[in-house]
Amino acid sequence: MDALALIMTMAAYLLGSISSAVLICRLLRLPDPRKVGSNNPGATNVLRIGGKGAAVAVLLCDMLKGTIPVWGGYFLGIDPIILGVIAIAACLGHMYPIFFHFKGGKGVATALGAIAPIGLDLTGLVMLTWLSVAVLFRYSSLAALVTVLVTPFYTWMFKPQYTLPVAMLCCLIVFKHHQNIRRLLSGEEPKIGEKKLIEKNSA
């Protein structure tokens, strides 16, 4: 990895470490999303505690955290594999933010933003998959898991040179959802829009 790639990777992690959910909730005088609901600082939990407007703002900001560094690396001519490393760095920043005591979100929106520079056709198909599962089953985590499992295949269809880095990114997201998987299997996972609070130790 050359100096430029290393700088972009570090910048991606630092940008990812800016917790949109926490900052927007502070701005709107909402509860800290790390302490209420699912205890996850992401758009779905902000939807539960703050409504659609706040959730959309968090979603867009989280996506930009992935899009900006990857698009920047793309225009600088960085190799696809290193672009994958940059995307993973942005998601790691979101999941384990240095500015917020390493307590972050699941990385789904940031990963979507990181994939967006590959192409609008791929991005649209990924979003359609998530939306379809979410509408059918009303579980955000299930929609995310199904989507990340099929996204490497979608990538292979459109831009096969990016399949490996996208697969690496998807594996990271599945790992971050291990507690959601356990709650889905036990029937304890809250559905989209539910106000039900989850015990802090189950987040």
Swiss-Prot record:
Catalyses:
an acyl phosphate + sn-glycerol 3-phosphate = a 1-acyl-sn-glycero-3-phosphate + phosphate
Enzyme class label: transferase
Enzyme Commission (EC) number? 2.3.1.275
In the bilayer, the protein is annotated as:
Multi-pass membrane protein
Q: Name one GO cellular component term.
A: plasma membrane
Q: Where in the cell is it found?
A: Cell inner membrane
As one GO molecular function, the record gives: acyl-phosphate glycerol-3-phosphate acyltransferase activity
Q: What is its main location?
A: membrane
Cross-referenced PANTHER family? GLYCEROL-3-PHOSPHATE ACYLTRANSFERASE-RELATED (PTHR30309:SF0), INNER MEMBRANE PROTEIN YGIH (PTHR30309)
Q: Which domain of life is it from?
A: Bacteria
Q: How does it assemble?
A: Probably interacts with PlsX.
Keyword flag Lipid metabolism? yes
Give the metabolic or biological pathway.
Lipid metabolism; phospholipid metabolism
Q: What's the protein name?
A: Glycerol-3-phosphate acyltransferase
What Pfam families has UniProt attached to this entry?
Answer: G3P_acyltransf
Known function: Catalyzes the transfer of an acyl group from acyl-phosphate (acyl-PO(4)) to glycerol-3-phosphate (G3P) to form lysophosphatidic acid (LPA). This enzyme utilizes acyl-phosphate as fatty acyl donor, but not acyl-CoA or acyl-ACP.
